[in-house]
Swiss-Prot record:
It comes from the Eukaryota. Residues 331-349 have a biased composition (Basic residues). Pfam families: DUF1609, DUF3654. Belongs to the UPF0329 family. Residues 304-424 are annotated as: Disordered. Residues 304-330, 350-388 have a biased composition (Basic and acidic residues). The lineage of its organism: Eukaryota, Fungi, Fungi incertae sedis, Microsporidia, Unikaryonidae. This is UPF0329 protein ECU05_1680/ECU11_0050.
Length: 612
């Protein structure tokens, strides 16, 4: 360990991560009276997140599970210790011996206990980190915890060093020696004070809880956006070798004024604290968080809550209106049904009455006929009687059986400009045509792919609607510039946006990648790479890194008349998509040409998190 005079050493080292309490590298900080290192409940390996605040042991798989279990069992307590307390380096090993005697076994025991509880599967990682802090810095009511005792031993050693200054040095050197170690003793008194240790535990608990709530409340793609934007994993990485840290598990931190953070939590509540922690995760430095900034965040949160309340009231009002309309429709439907029923009943009654009338008429007709018959019979009888007197009398004609005559009637009844490379625009064509062109092309990556593979890849590459967002003035609100690099003799730029692709009943979170180079003649950026890459939270670090872009990019770009102006791009007939721009998202929706209400695919690009 190197010699440090100006500050207490706060360390997260490669040695700690590699299952050893021995420190090989150190990061030093000068802390103010109220400043404190806060450990975030996220565990990293290289660029990637291995453990989230909400991760339980059962969520971990394979090698990640073994490595995390080993880290917890052997190193978690030592890592927390060197973040929060650190150590004093001197020319001999007296400090190391005291630490080994009093703290090493104590910390190992806490790590083993925390690991056992975490493996039980009930606790989240954030809760385990809280427990480790509580156990290490535990102070009883009398303020006589293990760390306090260790601190007293350190102070006694420092007092002894001050009293027994080295011999053989001048009076001036002796005064300087005692002055320096007196300052160190004063600092040690602060570091190991009961008040500070209790505050350490309280603040860490608040931060861990805030991180947990952030992860629980955000959608996967929103959390991906937060982590992609954040710089919390960069502070430690800047002080430790890239290759070394790429193979180690490590925690990250920030230095913040704990008194201000506690005051903010007590005055403004959990919502403001959560937003402050979120801003830290987005890269806000602790020394930038003062009372003025806290008030600014509180106002932002208050305004957001007001808008949310208005939105809820509006939605509630709409819901009530919708409910009233629905009830009105039901009443009208019921009324129409009853009216229809009544009308049907009325018609039935009318029909019944008509039948009665018809029967009456029939009876009247029958009676008339009967009377006619009677008259005829009377007349006929008279004629017969007259015929008896005269045989030459004529016989009258009669209707046989009383039949009626038939009537003969039947019953009645300003923007940014981009050029598009052919390797991007060809994805708008049919799979057969795409395959034909790739097979004739020079890129080994695509030559010889099956038609099925081309069809699958078309879903991820045929996203030309992204260009509408890219050339708009709001592009920077959605896309993160991951930096420039050179490959195959050309300078290239890569931009990434977090998004969700819905296709074939699947919902896939990932990133929209845009690769560009500058046209040498016009200086206009040319889009030569455009795709949606499926990735989860655990792979975000790699996907966002410049190394990933360079490794996965094509070796050489054919620049010989291979691109056209973006405005000339046209989709073939029958293809339909529309773009929908909202405050926090940009959507591209592909509909069925024969039935526009049916959505075939939807790509939603998330807005970057708001930095206050």
């Amino acid at each position: 360990m190197r010699r440090i005079y100006a500050a207490w050493t706060l360390v997260a080292a490669a040695g700690v991560m590699d299952c050893s309490p021995r420190l090989e590298k150190a990061a030093a900080f000068t802390l103010g009276p109220d400043s404190q290192v806060i450990v975030f409940p996220f565990m990293f390996q290289g660029y990637n997140i291995v453990v989230l605040p909400t991760t339980k042991y059962g969520d971990l798989k394979g090698n990640a599970r073994r490595r995390v279990a080993s880290f917890l069992e052997h190193n978690i307590s030592h890592a927390v210790w060197y973040f929060v307390v650190g150590g004093i380096a001197y020319k001999d090993d007296r400090s190391e011996r005291l630490f080994s005697e009093m703290m090493d076994g104590y910390l190992k025991k806490i790590s083993a206990g925390a690991s056992k509880v975490y493996k039980g599967g009930r606790k989240m990682f954030s809760e385990s980190l809280e427990t480790v802090h509580e156990m290490i810095f535990e102070c009883n009511k009398a303020g006589d915890g293990h760390v306090v005792k260790y601190g007293k031993s350190i102070i006694n050693r420092l007092s002894d060093m001050i009293e027994n200054a080295p011999t053989g040095i001048s009076a001036e050197e002796k005064r300087e020696y005692r002055r320096f170690w007196s300052r160190v003793k004063e600092r040690a008194g602060f570091l190991y004070s009961t008040e500070r240790l209790r505050r350490v535990v309280e603040v860490e608990k608040i931060v861990c809880n805030a991180c947990k709530e952030i992860c629980l409340k955000l959608k996967e793609e929103e959390l991906m956006g937060l982590l992609a934007e954040g710089k919390m994993k960069k502070d430690l990485k800047a002080t430790v070798d890239e290759d070394e840290i790429g193979h180690c598990l490590y925690l990250e931190y920030t230095v913040v004024n704990t008194s201000l953070l506690l005051d903010a939590h007590r005055e403004h509540g959990g919502d403001v604290t959560r937003e402050l922690v979120k801003q830290m995760l987005l890269g806000k430095k602790g020394d930038e968080i003062d009372r003025r900034y806290i008030n600014k965040v509180a106002n932002v949160v208050k305004e957001r809550q007001r808008r949310e309340m208005e939105k809820k009231e509006e939605e509630k009002k709409k819901e009530e209106e919708k409910k009233k309309e629905e009830e009105k429709r039901k009443e009208e439907k019921k009324k129409k049904k009853e009216e229809k029923k009544e009308e049907k009943k009325k018609k039935k009654e009318e029909k019944k009455e008509e039948k009665k009338e018809e029967k009456k008429e029939e009876k009247k007709e029958e009676k008339k006929e009967e009377k006619k018959e009677e008259k005829k019979e009377e007349k006929s009888g008279k004629s017969l009687r007259e015929g008896e007197a005269s045989e030459e009398a004529e016989m009258p004609s009669v209707e046989v059986g009383g039949a009626r005559r038939k009537t003969g009637k039947k019953s009645e009844g300003g923007r940014k400009r981009y050029k598009i490379h052919r390797r991007v625009s060809r994805w708008r064509k049919s799979p057969e045509k795409i395959k034909e062109e790739w097979d004739k092309g020079s890129e080994e990556k695509w030559r010889g792919r099956s038609l099925e593979e081309i069809k699958e890849q078309k879903v991820f590459h045929d996203i030309m609607g992204v260009l509408e967002l890219l050339r708009s003035e709001d592009a920077d609100k959605f896309f993160i510039d991951t930096g420039d690099y050179t490959k195959g003799g050309s300078e290239r730029q890569r931009m990434v946006a977090i998004g969700v692709l819905e296709s074939g009943g699947k919902r896939m979170a990932g990133v929209v990648e845009v690769g560009t180079f500058k046209d040498s003649s016009s200086g206009c950026p040319v889009v030569y790479h455009l795709m949606f890459r499926v990735t989860g939270i655990e792979g975000m670090g790699d996907v966002m890194s410049p190394e990933f872009a360079e490794a996965n990019d094509i070796e050489k770009i054919d620049k010989n008349r291979e691109y056209q102006d973006e405005g000339m791009f046209v989709y073939p007939r029958g293809v339909r998509f529309e773009t929908v721009k909202e405050t926090d998202a940009f959507q591209i929706v592909w509909g069925n040409p024969s039935n526009t209400s049916k959505v075939l695919r939807r790509l939603t690009i998330q807005r970057r998190p708001y930095v206050i």
